[in-house]
Amino acid sequence: MFNLPLTSVFVIFLFALSPIYGAFEYMQLVLQWPTAFCHTTPCKNIPSNFTIHGLWPDNVSTTLNFCGKEDDYNIIMDGPEKNGLYVRWPDLIREKADCMKTQNFWRREYIKHGTCCSEIYNQVQYFRLAMALKDKFDLLTSLKNHGIIRGYKYTVQKINNTIKTVTKGYPNLSCTKGQELWFVGICFDSTAKNVIDCPNPKTCKTASNQGIMFP
């Protein structure tokens, strides 16, 4: 009978207990409010709508990042595909031509996050999924329809509840150091078909009598 050394058995045991590399439990579509971002970083253009910051496959207990290799990204050559991405997912610190040529922002997000769902979505499918999920909600119009408009402060609870009314899931909010609404995370189950409450939402931290600015 073949006997494995005790150390080998221990390594195999640990590997069996580890999560499958690249497996994910949910996906978070991270939308950014360009005005808030551009108050912290010099921008080349400032869209007047929410734009995609990323689509992040993740696990509740273990953060997934960089599940592939640095050279896993393929430059997107298709013109309509690039245009569609730029409208929804622009690189705010670069001119349009530079963004679409170098694709640094898209590359960075895909290498860091997209590779963590590559067993299910290839690169083309990943970016198309991000665009499709973004198009499910007109977040800016929805906020306006619920009384949240630019230039005013609102409690974190009001913004959270409004977004949940629209998406049917509790969001993950992030703010700048100046307490401006920056990111809105909308979470989906692993099939990307159903909105869920975001696990472990960080949300914005404010004093009880202060709100956050929607600039």
Swiss-Prot record:
Enzyme class: lyase
Location of the active site: H53 (proton donor), E109, H113 (proton acceptor)
Molecular function terms, GO-annotated: ribonuclease T2 activity; RNA binding
Keyword Glycoprotein attached: yes
Residues that carry a glycan: N49, N59, N160, N172
Location in or out of the cell: Secreted, Extracellular space
Keyword Lyase: yes
Matching Pfam families: Ribonuclease_T2
Residues engaged in binding RNA: Q32, H53, D91, L92, R94, F105, R108, E109, K112, H113
Disulfide bonds: C38-C43, C67-C116, C175-C204, C187-C198
Reaction(s) catalysed by this chain's protein: a ribonucleotidyl-ribonucleotide-RNA + H2O = a 3'-end 3'-phospho-ribonucleotide-RNA + a 5'-end dephospho-ribonucleoside-RNA + H(+)
Record keywords, A-Z: Disulfide bond, Endonuclease, Glycoprotein, Hydrolase, Lyase, Nuclease, Secreted, Signal
Signal peptide: 1-22
Protein name, as recorded: Ribonuclease S-6
GO biological process, one term: RNA catabolic process
Gene Ontology cellular component terms for the protein in this record: extracellular region
Enzyme Commission number(s) from the entry: 4.6.1.19
Classification via CDD domains: RNase_T2_euk (cd01061)
Entry similarity comment: Belongs to the RNase T2 family.
Highest taxon listed in the record's lineage: Eukaryota
Its biological purpose: Self-incompatibility (SI) is the inherited ability of a flowering plant to prevent self-fertilization by discriminating between self and non-self pollen during pollination. In many species of the Solanaceae, self-incompatibility is controlled by the single, multiallelic locus S. This stylar glycoprotein is associated with expression of self-incompatibility in potato.
